[in-house]
Amino acid sequence: RSRGLGDVYKRQGYELLEKQSYLNLLLSRNVDAVLLIGSHFIENSPEENRYILEAASKIPVFILNGELKGDNIYSILCDDYMALKDMTDLVFARGSESPIYLYRTLNYSGQKKIQGFLDSCAEHGLDISQKNAFSAPGDLHKACSILEQLDADGISFDCVLAADDELATGAVKYALKKHLRVPEDFQVTGYNNSVLAACSTPEITTIDNRVEYMCVTSVSQMMQVFQKEIPPSRTMFSGTIVKKQTTK
C-alpha cells in the first residue's frame, strides 16, 4: 500500500491519458466518491471530459475550483473572472496606465482570470488587440526573466497582475532589479493569498480565492449526498482582495 493511491496524489502530470488512468484507478478501488482538485481536470473539448461524466454515472464526482455540468457532478468554485476584473479595476483606480498579466495555463480557471483582466482593460480604454497577457509557466526566477525580456523588447508596463503569488513574487524581484519603487512606480498583484504573498518584501496585494471555504463545502456536500440529500450542483464563492503593500 506504499504505492498506488499515494502516488496518484503526488504526480504532477495532468495529461489527459494520465488523468483518465488515475480516475479509473480510483474507481477500481470501489471508492464512494471522487474529489477532483483544480480546474486542470476540465478540458475545453466535451469529448475529453467524457471520462468524468462516465465516472459520475457510477459515483458522485466533486470538482474543486472547476466546473462541469452533468448528473451527479458537483462543482465548488471561486468566481475567478470577477476576482481578476476587480483587481484590475483596482490598479487602474490607483493610477496604473499600462498593466500586463502573467499566467501559467489557460485551463478553466485560467481562462476566467484572463477574461476578467481583458474586460477591465477594455473598459478602461486599453487596446486589447495589443498583446498584454503573457505566458509564464516557470518559477519566480523565470517570471522575473520574462519581464526583463519584455522590457528589453520595448514593451511598456507599469503594473503586473499575476495568476498566482509565485509569479507576483517574480514581478517584485524584477522591480527591485530595475530599481523601481513599489508601489509608487510599479504595482504588483498576486492570487491565492498564499504564504509567498506574506513572505515577500514588500508584501504582495493578492486575492483570497476562498480555498478553505471551498474545501469545507465540498466535504459537507459529499456528506449530504451520502445521506441521500441533494446539494446544489454549482456553488460559487466570491474572491476577496487582500490589500497589502504592492498597490497604491
Locate the predicted segments by residue:
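Flexible loop/hinge segments that line or gate small-molecule binding clefts
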Residues: Y14, I37-M82, D86, E166, ...
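Structural motif
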Residues: K10-S28, L84-K85, S135-G154
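Alpha-helical structural signal in soluble globular domains
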Residues: Y51-A55, Q115-H124, C144, Q149, ...
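Periplasmic-binding protein-like
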Residues: V31-H40, I100-Y103, A133, G154-D164, ...
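Hydrophobic alpha-helical segments within soluble ligand-binding/sensing domains
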Residues: N72-Y101, Q111, D119, D139-E148, ...
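Short, small-residue-biased leader/transition segments that mark boundaries at the very start
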Residues: S2-Y9
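Flexible loop/turn connectors
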Residues: E148-K248
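An alpha-beta-alpha
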Residues: K85-L126, K131, S233-T247
